[in-house]
Amino acid sequence: MTITANGNPAYFTKVEEVVKAAPKLQDWKFTTFVQPQHAYEELENGLDKPYVFQDITLKTSELKFMPFKYNCEKKIDMIVYLKNFTLYSHNKNLLQLIYFMMQDLLGEKSLYENINFVELGQLPDEEKNELICMYDLQYYLDHLNSQPL
């Protein structure tokens, strides 16, 4: 059973307390927060399953990002680039889907401890070297968090 704070940092401590106090039950495992769901190798090779939501179909392996601000709380602001942003930009659920995909990639706690703001944009026709594959986001965050401010 996963106990979640639904991304609300105000409840992170409570979630940890509940799981710590949970009774030991046969065949039950209590887990704090939504955990990462992807195998890195599948993402790197483009073998991940697409997320399909209403008229949107996206694969994490096809997303790129560019951080543009890093604050003193060790949180980044970033732009997530999509191949078909112009096609999907009218959909009010697009940003929510991107956050859901990032939660599957990073896990609930890491997402809300490390990401401050997400903007969406069209992936350029000529891919720039400074864009980072979305599946490398956790590695990028780990590197940032290992550096002194």
Where are these regions (language model features)?
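Long, contiguous binding/interaction regions
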Residues: 7-149
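Short hydrophobic/aromatic beta-strand micro-patches
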Residues: 2-6
